[in-house]
Amino acid sequence: GVPINVPCTGSPQCIKPCKDAGMRFGKCMNRKCHCTPK
């Protein structure tokens, strides 16, 4: 995935930031959001 500079404690928190970044499938890894490009 593509790491973005968004802190998180759970993957659901990454859904919107990833969509806002034009990507999908956010996951929380190492307390940062990681997104999958479209």
Curated annotation (Swiss-Prot):
Disulfide bond positions: 8-28, 14-33, 18-35
Coiled-coil intervals: none
Interaction with Ca(2+)-activated K(+) channels: region residues: 26-33
Keywords recorded for this protein, A-Z: Disulfide bond, Ion channel impairing toxin, Neurotoxin, Potassium channel impairing toxin, Secreted, Toxin
Main location: secreted
UniProt-annotated location(s): Secreted
Entry's Gene Ontology cellular component terms: extracellular region
GO molecular function: ion channel inhibitor activity; potassium channel regulator activity; toxin activity
Record carries keyword Disulfide bond: yes
Keyword Phosphoprotein tagged: no
Tissue localization of expression: Expressed by the venom gland.
Domain of life: Eukaryota
Domain characteristics, as noted in the entry: Has the structural arrangement of an alpha-helix connected to antiparallel beta-sheets by disulfide bonds (CS-alpha/beta).
Family (UniProt): Belongs to the short scorpion toxin superfamily. Potassium channel inhibitor family. Alpha-KTx 03 subfamily.
Function recorded in the entry: Potent inhibitor of shaker potassium channels as well as the mammalian homologs of shaker.
Protein name: Potassium channel toxin alpha-KTx 3.3
Organism: Leiurus hebraeus
